[in-house]
Every structure is written in C-alpha cells, then in structure tokens.
A protein has these predicted regions:
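N-terminal leader/targeting and accessory segments in enzymes
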Residues: 1-81, 85, 340-342, 367-382, ...
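Mobile, glycine- and charge-enriched loop segments
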Residues: 20-31, 120, 131, 135-147, ...
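Residue-level signal for inorganic ion chemistry
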Residues: 27, 46, 82, 97, ...
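Active-site beta-alpha connecting loops in nucleotide-dependent enzymes
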Residues: 34-37, 303-306, 323-393, 420
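Acidic, Mg2+-coordinating active-site environments of NTP-dependent enzymes
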Residues: 60-65, 172-317, 342-343, 368-377, ...
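Phosphate-binding loop of NTP-binding sites
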Residues: 77-209, 213, 217-226, 260, ...
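ATP-dependent carboxylate/acyl-activation modules
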Residues: 97, 305-307, 422, 426-428
Length: 432
C-alpha cells in the first residue's frame, strides 16, 4: 500500500499511537521495534484495545483477510513518510527548534506567547527524536496556523533526518554546548550537527532563522540565511537585558525602533534562561503578538518537569534543575547560583552522562570550578564525580545520599539540585 492510501486511512483515525497499552478508540497503531521489544507482537492487543488499524512490518502478525492490518516494509520508515506526507498536505508554517540547552524551555515559552493570538501545535514534553517528531506532525489539523517542532540530537545526522521529515519554514538554534559528546565525538561535531538545521533552511527560498546575536558559534554558521536577530546590542530586531535574578529572572526588551523598554518579571530561575525568553519575545513579535500579550504570557509561564523550578519546603528553598546536565548547562547553573542573593547555599550535583572520552576531564573542571567559587557545602553524586579530585562529600548514588539526608537533614538552606536525569536527583526532593 502506498503512502497516499495509508494517509487516507490515517485521516479516518482519531489519533496515532505506538504504545499498545494506550490505544484510544479509533486510533492508528504503528508497530515499532526496539532492542528489547517487537511492536508487531502487540498489534492484535492494540486492535482489541481500541485501535481501528495496525501498521505492521512482519506479515506473520497480520491474519489473512483481516483488513485492519496494513503490512509495510518498515513501520518506522512508514511513520516518518506518513508524517512528512501529512505535513505537506497541511502546509502549516513550521518553526523548527534545536540546540544543546534550553530548547524545551524555549519551545514552551514560544508556544505560550504564540498561543495568545494563534492556534499553535507544539511538541509535547520532549518528544523530539525520530519517533517523536513524526508523531507531533501527525497531530497537525487544518485549524492550526502555526507549529513549533522541537528536534533533538545525540549523533551526527540526527537533525538532518528530522528537518527532512518536518520541512520547517523557520528555524532557531538556541545554542551549542557540550552534550552527548559520546555520540558526537567532539564539540565541533555538535556544532556541525546542530548546523544541519541551517543547512536545510538554505535550500528553502523563503526560509528565515531567528538567531541569538550574542552567540559567536551561531553567527559563524548562519551565513547565507535571512536572519531575524535578537540579543544585547542596539539595532537588532529585538534588544534586551537582564535586570534582576534573585531568584526569578527579570528582563527588559524593545524592538529596534523603540526607545522605551518593556519590563518582564518571569517565574524562571537563572540568567541562562534570558536568551530563551528573548527568543520567545522575538518570535512572538515577528508573528504579530502584541507586546502587552507577550509580556503577560511570559510572566504567567511556570516551568515544569524539574527544569529550573523553585520549590519551598518546610525547611529549605530548592532550585530543582534535575532533568538533564552537561558541562555547559552545569557551569551556567553553578555560575547563576554563585551570583544569586541567598544565604546558606548548598549544592547537590549529579554525574553528567554521555560525555565519552571527555567525561573525566569535564567532571574535573566542574569540581575545580566549585572550589574556585568558594562553595563549601557540596554533595557530589555518582561514580564520575567520585573519581575527581575535590574536598567535598561524595556519594556513589542517590540512595547513599538519601540515607545521609535521613540521618542529618539540611535546614535553612538554599539548595541547587542539578544532574543528568539518569542520576534520579529529583527523588531527593522529599527528603529536603
């Protein structure tokens, strides 16, 4: 069956699912394979649970004569081709977003701002890979007049694959930093991979990028593209400055031809979120959202999922940034915490994963920076930090840290919690 015919079937379905445990009535189930599972084996269950059709790529799982089964050569490729075909049919303007740090927060901020005057489809959570991007595109409906599609990468070529599926009309790279070094091989590999967004947009005649003018790496690879620039310099499309950060980020912004600044009080923690917020201002303004609506949207946005969240417990004030960590974001968080006005500071930091051959060196740099900042009350969690030279308390895993917190609970402290999601630092919150 060709993709046009599959698309016609898709249009009769209520939604698309790849999880046989979650099959809404009338949905299309697509059987994917992984290292430890074969979705084909669950196609029958999906149909019993509510799916109207099931796409499988092993004929043995499709009973002869049952028209609810659609047999294809490769289910994953079919998912991606179907998403691309649907995207072309909808013709919705798409803003593609990638970057090492801040892309999910920026996506949320952009979508919040744009939703003031537009019907916006945007990536849910961080479904930003070769499966998540197609699933996002397949949620496009005629009533959507804009889409914000987040794209993640952990290996060279990942962004190239995703932009060819999504075919964005606009692009933004939040920044480039040291993450997934194990997959990319080097910092240069990261720049090249993130730059695949720009490479694709150069092939589109009317394409536009939104660029943080203060970032030299982005400026270097943005040649030959129509640019809408934002940053700290005068004369840019949007110009802005941080005005406060204790603990919430406050900033001002104005357009290139305005003389008066707009002041925004956010619920975001950290100066490192300023470029993310300014990107949302820029894109909102570009798409016709009024300044007052932009300011209101940003002021009302509350971060979720352990991303720079402020939480007050009965005993302490917590800054929870335990969703992910890499050398760039870790340095930014520590630097911001250093400059924050607060007494009795404590840091709980977890290992940074997927750094490959650079891992030992990058963890040592963080330990050295903590010493340089003069922090005394620090708990380092994980085997990678344990192997560094430092004068701090070290724990092999979060279980050991929790045992210590149960013996002696900190009180009256402002505590930064930062580490890779796999370290599970979010589980310490209830003990603080």
């Amino acid at each position: 069956m060709n993709i046009t015919a599959i698309h016609q079937i898709f249009l009769t379905c209520t939604s698309v699912t790849t999880d046989s445990r979650n099959c809404p009535q009338g949905s299309l189930f697509i059987a994917l394979k992984g290292e430890s599972f074969n979705g084909n084996a669950f196609a029958a269950r999906a149909l019993e649970s509510g799916s109207a059709y099931a796409i499988v790529d092993e004929e043995a799982y499709a009973p002869a004569g049952d028209t609810r089964y659609i047999v294809v050569e490769n289910s994953l490729k079919t998912l991606q081709q179907l998403a691309n075909y649907h995207r072309r049919q909808m013709r919705t303007p798409i803003i593609g977003i990638t970057g090492t740090n801040g892309k999910t927060t920026t996506k949320e901020l952009m979508s919040t701002v744009l939703s003031q005057t537009h019907n916006v489809l945007y990536t849910l959570g961080n479904l930003n890979n070769h499966i998540g991007v197609p699933l996002t595109l397949l949620r496009l409906r005629p009533e959507h007049d804009l889409a914000v599609v987040e794209m993640g990468a952990s290996h060279p070529g990942d962004i190239k694959e995703l932009v060819e599926i999504a075919e964005p009309d606009y692009g933004i790279i939040t920044n480039v930093g040291k993450a997934h070094l194990e997959g990319f091989g080097s910092f240069e590999g990261i720049i090249k991979t993130k730059g695949e967004m720009y490479d694709y947009l150069r092939t589109r005649k009317e394409a536009t990028i939104f660029i943080h003018n203060d970032n030299p790496y982005l400026k270097k690879i943005a040649y030959g593209l129509h640019q809408i620039a934002y940053g700290s310099e005068d004369g840019l499309y949007i110009n802005g400055h941080v005005t406060g950060n204790s603990p919430y980020l406050t900033f001002e912004w104005k357009t290139g031809n305005e003389s008066k600044y707009h002041e925004v009080q956010t619920q975001l923690i950290g100066e490192y979120n300023f470029p993310n917020a300014l990107a949302a201002v820029t894109i909102g303004h570009f798409f016709g959202v009024e300044p007052e609506q932009i300011d209101k949207a940003l002021a009302g946005y509350t971060p979720q999922n352990n991303r720079s969240q402020l939480k007050k417990t009965a005993d302490n004030t917590l800054i929870i940034d335990a969703y992910n960590a890499n050398p760039t974001s870790m340095m930014a968080s520590i630097s911001n915490f250093r400059n924050m006005q607060a007494e009795n500071k404590m840091l709980i930091l977890g290992d940074m994963r997927e750094l490959g051959k650079d891992s030992a060196d990058e963890h040592q740099k963080i330990a050295d920076y903590l010493e340089e900042c003069g922090f005394k009350d620090v708990a380092l969690v994980g085997k990678l930090f344990a192997a560094t030279r430092h004068s701090y308390q070290s724990y092999p895993d979060v279980t050991a840290l929790i045992a210590e917190l149960q013996r002696e609970k900190p009180c009256g402290k402002t505590i930064l919690i930062k580490g890779s999601n796999g370290i599970k630092l979010s589980s310490v919150v209830e003990y603080l």
